[in-house]
Amino acid sequence: MSGKRVVVGMSGGVDSSVTAWLLKQQGYEVIGLFMKNWEDDDDSEYCSTRQDWLDVVSVADLIGVDVEAVNFAAEYKDRVFADFLREYSAGRTPNPDVLCNAEIKFKAFLDHAMSLGAETIATGHYARVRQNAAGRFELLKALDHTKDQSYFLHRLNQAQLSRTLFPLGEIPKTRVREIAAEIGLPNAKKKDSTGICFIGERPFRDFLNRYLPTKPGPMKTPDGKVVGEHIGLAFYTLGQRKGIGLGGSREGSGDAWYVARKDMASNTLYVVQGHDHPWLLTPTLVAADLSWVAGEPPLAGASMAAKTRYRQSDAPCVVDAADGDMLKLAFAEAQWAVTPGQSAVLYDGDVCLGGGIIQSAQ
């Protein structure tokens, strides 16, 4: 691989730093690129952008690679954040990381990398890419299934995967930390980032309240009994237990309360008691806005596995239909709190086939 130019997305974290080091050891000409995807609150107690950039510079200096910063904030607000607000306004719970990967990290970033003369890009994602016997590129789970991030990458297409390297896909996370310590990376003990990137560590409701108005309404049980008031449907997600404002049962049971449904027309939030309440369990779902890694949908009747949220175990299912921009899945066992706005992602073993945005569950 000597001399081939690769642009590595460097965030200031351990994973992308080790990625850059590994590729340099393999003989690549490595250029580090730091993406600034959010303009606001640079001086906020919750914003780490400035420190992240300083970490990138320190790592680049240590391992001997050139690094630059590029601002994709305008693209991010237009392609990702606007959709995020639309989805919450409609009562759904989006996953902006999925859209960010497809539109920013593997589109705007990829285009910029190609303008720098790179042949490929690389990121610190835990996933794998391989080319099969037919010449198509496949997206696979990372060998370390506990850290696998293929769920967030399922919208990547053939052109994107053909130009992408995921060096950490073959390495356990524990080994990545060991490498960082062994080579003396200044950020070797830095915590992994969690949550939505533009929200950071700030309270989610506080952030969302800056952009969406609160519209209080009744909180009801399935039989119509009013048990409280919600602050606005956008501020709740299906399966949510904390932050509802209800203690034990009004009828004496100590079971926890969960958000079960949202009725946008009447501005009603329905809550139920007990983790396994029937309203939280659904055997089928419908998804739209589909994207398939190979460019083609699976055949109706095919037995697959699916995730309806990150970190969920693969759930056996059958493809009831995959026509045009509509996917219907029937699960072997009813799934818990299937949430409109989240992604339903299909797998055939370790191979990620793609998926779509959940529209409804029944």
UniProtKB/Swiss-Prot annotation:
Catalytic center residues: 100, 197
Stretch list, region Interaction with target base in tRNA: 95-97
Highest taxon above the source species: Bacteria
Residues of the site described as Interaction with tRNA: 125, 342
Localization, UniProt: Cytoplasm
Its biological purpose: Catalyzes the 2-thiolation of uridine at the wobble position (U34) of tRNA, leading to the formation of s(2)U34.
Keyword list, A-Z: ATP-binding, Cytoplasm, Disulfide bond, Nucleotide-binding, RNA-binding, Transferase, tRNA processing, tRNA-binding
Catalysed reactions, semicolon-separated: S-sulfanyl-L-cysteinyl-[protein] + uridine(34) in tRNA + AH2 + ATP = 2-thiouridine(34) in tRNA + L-cysteinyl-[protein] + A + AMP + diphosphate + H(+)
Similarity-based family: Belongs to the MnmA/TRMU family.
Disulphide bond pairs: 100-197
Region described as Interaction with tRNA: 147-149, 309-310
GO cellular component: cytoplasm
Native source organism of the sequence: Cupriavidus pinatubonensis (strain JMP 134 / LMG 1197) (Cupriavidus necator (strain JMP 134))
UniProt-recorded Gene Ontology molecular function terms: ATP binding; tRNA binding; tRNA-uridine 2-sulfurtransferase activity
Protein name: tRNA-specific 2-thiouridylase MnmA
Enzyme class: transferase
NCBIfam families: PRK00143.1, trmU
Keyword Cytoplasm (UniProt): yes
Pfam families to which the protein is assigned, alphabetical: tRNA_Me_trans (PF03054), tRNA_Me_trans_C (PF20258), tRNA_Me_trans_M (PF20259)
GO annotation, biological process: tRNA wobble position uridine thiolation
Main location: cytoplasm
